[in-house]
Structures are given as C-alpha cells and as structure tokens.
C-alpha cells in the first residue's frame, strides 16, 4: 500500500474536489472504493455542472458587463475575453466530470500499483518522491494570478459587485483545478517513474550475470511480468486523465495566446489608455502567461519522465536478448509490443504530451498571435477611415 502513502499529501485535496475518488480503509486492511465515494464525486460534479451552466449563461449573454477596461478594448478584445472566460468554465467543469466518470478505473489503477508495491518492497524498493518545492511554485503562481485579478477587477474595472464575484469565482475554480490536476499527476507519475526505474536497474544487471542459470530465468520472467503490468497501468493513467488534459491544454493555449495579444493591444492603444491601465493590463497578462506556462511545464515534464522510463525497458531488454537463446522467447513477448509502438502520453489522442509540447504550443501561439494582430490593425484602420470621413 506504499503508493497510497506516497501520494497522501496531494490525495486529500484532490479527493475533496473530486479529482481523485474517495476510498475507505487503511494501510493494514486495504482500501476500498465504496458507494459513499461514488456519490460524493457525483454530488460535486452536479454542483459544478449546474454552477457552470448558470455562470456560462451570464457570461455569454452579458459579456459587456465583464469588460475589464472598457476604454481600451475594441470588439476583438471583448470577444477574446468572453471566449477565454467561457473556456475557463468549460475547462474546470470537464476536469471534474471526466474525473468522476473515470473514478472506478482510477481506483483500480491505484489498487494495481499497490499490489505490485508488495513485490517491490520485498526486493528492496524504498524510494519516495516529493514535489514540495514545485507545489510552492505552482500555488504561488496561481495565487499571484488571483491576487492581481482581484486588484484589477475590484479597483480598476467598472464591473458591478455581483459580476466581480462571478468572475473571481470562475478564475479561482480554474486555477484550483488546474493546480490540483498538475500536482496530482506529477506526484503519481514520478512515483511510477521511480518504480519502473528501480525495475530497469535490476533488469540491467542481467547484462553482467550468467544467463544460463534457471534462477536467473525465473527472476527475469518475474521482472518482465511486472514491467508489462506497469506499462498497462501507465496506459490506464493516460486514459483516465486524457480528457482532463485535453481541455486544460486547450484552455492554456488560448489563454497564453489571448493574454499575449491583450498585452500588445494595450501597449498600442496609445491615447485611449492611461499609463496606469497599460501597466496593470500587462501585469495581469504576464502573470496569466507565467502561471499557465509553469503548470504546463510541470505536466509535460512528468509525462515525458514516465514515458522515458517505460520506453527504456525495451532498450535494456534488447541488450539482454542476444545473451541466451532461452531468454529470447520470453523477451520477444515484451519487445513485440514495445518496439512497434513507444508509449506516449496524449491529450485524449489529439496530441502527444512531452517536453517538446511546450515548443509546439508556443510556435502555434506565435502564428496565431500574428493573425490576431493583423485583425486588430485592420479594425483600427477601419475606425480611422470612418473618423476621417
């Protein structure tokens, strides 16, 4: 049951907000996913869904009431802000709904890891993973966004008190769920990477041993069986988190693009904005981009690290393959699947998530930003033509 202890610090807040299913029991007697855990998750999902529909309707049909700087915003900026706010709502709602929908599969995956931990502990595995520093960094960035947004919405905008609360609530829920999702996945994936890395180290020792002994054959057989189970577990984690990752990365991509564009639009607003408004707008945009970038880095690096460990197993087995003919049939069963298709984490199959994902995202952001700037310039030129006429 070591896995439950390893993820305990992040598991409690994740359970409260229905990202991780509530399970009952203890380390000695085992854990169970009962009816109370199921209904709690469904209740949270229902509350979030109803709240999101209500908030989304107000944002969609009263978008002008949510304009942060009315004097500095044209039609393009207003539309972009509205879309961003709606994506905020959709993103955290889908994270909750997807997590609750996959709760049973999620728990079974954790239970499978716990069973394998018994074998690992018997073979000397004692490693633990802590992301305390990352937790401080990610939560500080999220808190910074919320603090700047509060200052800007409350003190600098003309938004009414009721809609100030609505907008801040939307931002809070999005930041909360994106932070919890990133930290939970990071903790779980890096713990898995440690376990697979430990097995890979044991597997690598077969290059230095006499492969003719029957005892070595049994040990290799056990290792390959456990590694096959870990590959299956890793694929299950991707299935459980795939929808959440898709909607989160979709929101992050749009937010990074939109906030970069809004910073540009504010800088080029000229006499329409005061210097104070320019500084505040850029500050809000920069903190948004920074927070989303940090969160994406946390997720991408975790996915890449775990996938690298899983795919590294096939490379080690390939080196052992030629040492003894009696090992070849055993190794073939693993290599046949692993060599044909390396493990990749994906956002529900739409795109892969690894260390190169951020580069691809920012390349796309740059292209999209150029298009938005051209639309802005076209809009400004039309306004000038009308004023001159």
UniProtKB/Swiss-Prot annotation:
Homology family: Belongs to the insect chemoreceptor superfamily. Gustatory receptor (GR) family. Gr21a subfamily.
Keyword terms, alphabetized: Behavior, Cell membrane, Glycoprotein, Membrane, Receptor, Transducer, Transmembrane, Transmembrane helix
Protein name per UniProt: Gustatory receptor 68a
Top-rank lineage group of the source organism: Eukaryota
Subcellular location field: Cell membrane
Distribution of this protein across tissues and organs: Expressed in chemosensory neurons of about 20 male-specific gustatory bristles in the forelegs. No expression is seen in the mechanosensory neurons. In larvae, expressed in the ventral pharyngeal sense organ.
Disruption phenotype: Mutant males display robust courtship behavior in the presence of CH503-perfumed females.
Gene, per the UniProt record: Gr68a
Glycosylation sites: 80, 258
Chief localization: membrane
GO MF annotations, alphabetized: ligand-gated monoatomic ion channel activity; taste receptor activity
Positions on the Extracellular side per record topology: 64-82, 155-164, 258-281, 374-389
Any Gene Ontology CC annotation: neuronal cell body
A Pfam family: 7tm_7
Membrane-crossing residue ranges in chain numbering: 43-63, 83-103, 134-154, 165-185, 237-257, 282-302, 353-373
GO BP: chemosensory behavior; detection of chemical stimulus involved in sensory perception of taste; male courtship behavior; male courtship behavior, tapping to detect pheromone; monoatomic ion transmembrane transport; response to pheromone; sensory perception of taste; signal transduction
Segments on the Cytoplasmic side according to the record's topology features: 1-42, 104-133, 186-236, 303-352
General function of this protein: Dsx-dependent essential component of pheromone-driven courtship behavior. Recognizes a female pheromone involved in the second step (tapping step) of the courtship display which is essential for efficient execution of the entire courtship sequence and timely mating. Required for detection of the male sex pheromone CH503 which is transferred from males to females during mating and inhibits courtship behavior by other males.
Record's bilayer topology term: Multi-pass membrane protein
